[in-house]
Amino acid sequence: MPGAGTFKLFIGNLDEKTQATELRALFEKYGTVVECDVVKNYGFVHMETEQQGRDAIQNLNGYTLNEFAIKVEAAKSRRAPNTPTTKIFVGNLTDKTRAPEVRELFQKYGTVVECDIVRNYGFVHLDCVGDVQDAIKELNGRVVDGQPLKVQVSTSRVRPKPGMGDPEQCYRCGRSGHWSKECPRLYGSAGGGREPPSPLSAGGYRDRMYGRDPYPPPPPPPPFLRDRIMDGFRDYDYYDRRFEDSRDLYERRYQTSRMRDFPPPPISRREPMPLPPTLSGSLRSCSVSRGYDTMFSRRSPPPPRSSNGMSRYGSPTPHGYEDFSRDAFDERMISSRGMRGPSPPGRRYAPY
């Protein structure tokens, strides 16, 4: 088991057929190998001292083993606190420049904890104990492989790769508090885009379950069509229409005479029935009272019977039928035409 004073190295980009014995034999050239383990396409090597490990990194990083260029660097313990370092950006590199060359340039100014090359630029993590300002001042503009280097302190933040952080965090931006489908990056938060939907809004959780947007409400109908539709549902009473207009008595009674098929108004809406008027032989004797319904006709009292059972018109009156005088017929005709006139005092109905 490796002791606490060993220097642990990480070896990446290994061939799956690479054995631990091959890796141990490769690193024993630079010092004592305390332990060597291979896990699929990467492994770990524990060197006896830090200096032996630095020598192995400088010589074996980028070395071709089983047709694969291996990556050798100091392993970072997740339990132990990281060594404070300064991240330096190195730009304007050529395709021929390798990480060992860049590492060798910075080793003069302190311990190089990590050195990575990404296409035409790279990053160097230099121990804070070293002289970072001198390294930037002297190496900025130095020509390497025919191109001047650009060296400065890196301003980028170390961010986890999408999907590799906390499972409760958004895999697009690495932040918590929202789902990946509501990430501000999708809606252009910096460019004045539309706002992401709220999870508490109507249909928010339903959209998350089914993955589709809710159907929008239908547009309202045009004003003229809406008025036409609403007119069909308005409840008008015949008697309300009869009394709401400002027509005169003649027109109202004319309309009433044309619509005799309708039933009489409710009792609560009827006006009190006036006393029966007196009868007269002339047309002026007819009195039409306001509110009197013309559907019911007044009848005159039966004439006095003669001793021989004959009516005043000379025809016999059969039993079971009642006589109607011409005065009652005239009154019905005048009432339907709307004629008005006061009734002079005269004789009233005879008691039945």
From Swiss-Prot:
Residues 7-77, 86-156 form the RRM domain. It is found in: Cytoplasm; Nucleus. GO terms for cellular component: catalytic step 2 spliceosome; cytoplasm; nuclear speck; nucleus; precatalytic spliceosome. Residues 214-224, 262-277 have a biased composition (Pro residues). Keywords: Biological rhythms, Cytoplasm, Metal-binding, Nucleus, Phosphoprotein, Repeat, RNA-binding, Zinc, Zinc-finger. It holds the Pfam family zf-CCHC. It comes from the Eukaryota. Its main location: cytoplasm. Residues 279-288 have a biased composition (Polar residues). Changing C170Y: Defects in sensory bristle formation and wing shape, and oogenesis. Expressed in the CNS and in CCAP neurons of the ventral nervous system (VNS), which control insect ecdysis. Induction: Oscillates in abundance during the circadian cycle at the protein level; peaks during the subjective day. The modification Phosphoserine is found at S198, S201, S315, S325. One of its GO terms (biological process) is ovarian nurse cell to oocyte transport. The keyword Zinc-finger applies. A zinc finger (CCHC-type) spans 168-185. Gene3D superfamilies: 3.30.70.330, Zinc finger, CCHC-type. The keyword Zinc applies. Residues 187-228, 254-352 are annotated as: Disordered. One of its GO terms (molecular function) is RNA binding. Residues 320-334 have a biased composition (Basic and acidic residues). Essential RNA-binding protein. May be required for circadian repression of eclosion. Also essential for nurse cell dumping during oogenesis, the process whereby the cytoplasmic contents of nurse cells are transferred to the oocyte late in it's development. This is RNA-binding protein lark.
